[in-house]
Structure formats: C-alpha cells, structure tokens
C-alpha cells in the first residue's frame, strides 16, 4: 500500500515543529530586529537539566543558565513521566531537521538503511547516547560549565560557529546529523542524542525513583557515595531497561489499538519515524521509542489507532491532546522559571551598620578590597 502524506491529517505536529524551527531561524538570524541579543540556549531543556545536576552537586550554575532553563528541563521530565517524549515529537529542532531530511530522501526514492529495532546492531548502537550522556554531565558538573556546547550541532549553527564551541566536535556532530538522518531513519535520536537517553530512562520512572531513593538513603546513612556513581548507575540502568525491557507501561497517554478495526496492512509501522512494530501490538502501543507524534494514527485508513488513556477513548480531540499538552507544559516552564531564581552565591561582603532610617545597611571599605580570581569562568 502506498504511503500517503500526513501533513494535513497530523497538522498539530507539523504546526509546532515547523513553527518552532521558523521562529528560531527568524530570531537567530535577526530578521526581526531586537535590542536584546538572542540567546539560543534560552529555553534549552538539556542545558536546564545539566544546570540542575550542577546545582544539586555543587550548589552552582553554569554561567549562562538560569531558573528558566532548569524549569524547562523539569517540564520535559514531567512530560516524559506522565505522557511521553513530547519535546522530541513536537519541539526539538534537530528532530525536525531529521524529519525534513528523511522526507527529502523519500522524495528522491532513496531507501534508508534498515537497522531493525531489537537487532544486535540496534542494541549496540543505543549504548552510544548513554556514553555521551555520562561524558557530558560528568564534564559539566565538574567544570560548572555546559560541556555540551562543545559538540551540540544546534548550538554551533545557532551561534554561527561563534559560540563557546570546539570546532571539530561541532563539525563532526553536524555531519553525523545530516548524513545519519539521510541514511538511517531517526539515527541521531535513536543512537546519539543524550537528551533522548534521559527521556527514555525517565519513561521507566519507577525504577529511577528507586535508584534515586537508594542513593539518598545511602547518603543519609553516611555512605557519602560520589555523585558520579549515581550518574553512571542512571546511564547503565537506562540502557539496560531500554534494550531488555523496551515496553514502559507507566505513562498515562498512549496510542491505543482497536484490534477489531485493524486490517494488518502495516502502514502504521512504515509511517512511524522509529518503525515501531505497531502491527504486532495488542491494545496499547508500549514502546520506549514512542513519542506520541501521531504519525501512525494519522496514516491509519481504518481508524484502528487512537491516542487515549484507554482503548475506549474516542474522538479526534484525543489525537491533538499531546500537542496541546506540549504547549501547556512549555508555558508552565516559562511561567515558573520567571517566578524564582536559584541562589548560587551566599557570600556577603562588608560591615553592617545602622543607616539613617534605622535600618541595617552594608558598608564596604574600598581600601580593604582585594582582587578575587575566579577560575572556571569562560566568556561566550
């Protein structure tokens, strides 16, 4: 059966994906003049999660991070725990570029290389993103500086290769994104994206909750286990769960399959960006790769697939719910991020004296000031 386009039937996905990509291009290139310099990291959840880890480990934040990015990272995790990988489906610019390149390849009638889900090659390649996750977070927390900027293809392009990058790392990353997505569907997302590793791991949030609980209990009991051990355990547990138990069942929303309406045509699997074997699913589609992007639902000619809490969910409104939830969670992250600031400096200078209005004020004697050298800060 020929594959039909889902751009119209799955319009919420494309509206958000292309809208975000166009907005980034417009603001970063300066097509809309602004008195304030555009920060390509302003709403980055990956940077926010690295900042949160640094804050918890060192009580400091990377110099370019704030509570806004931290809240965006928390919003991403909340979306994964409750629903699915909504950021991956609707917002991520790298995922959108991946999708566009795949569509261009299909338009040229070039077949992609097939790395079957669950194959030996698939399982081996999936470990790479967890290795990158450990490397990036370990380096970031140790230096209190976002290490991912050295190799992030989005950051390199968004800054015109003028940001705090390592040129050869950035070029290699960009080549991998372009060539990988042209040769293998969702190559970056499946095998290399560290944020994808975080998202996949938090799909098994009960296991991760137990892991964090054990670490906290050990700390209370005085074990003083280094934070890097927790990071390593997080990556290892996430990888093992992904390859040996790739069917998380703890999310509220899922793609539900009506077995009676399904004609086993297999079109849903072909349209799925990750080629999840939906045809073999019984009832709910439980897959660690599922992002609730809606491609399978939009391509089904018999109406056998539906987004919902249970198989009894009916109506088209359910199918646009993931996109709506994405917007709501992002709006919440932006709102919450503007409501507070994480305190990272608690040192005070000067001598407190009684002011004219009977309030205590800080007085600094300029003669007593000394030069303070702060290591580890880098300009952007």
Name every feature range the model reports, one short phrase each.
Residues 1-271, 275-282, 288, 297-298, ...:
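Non-ligating segments of multi-cofactor redox enzymes
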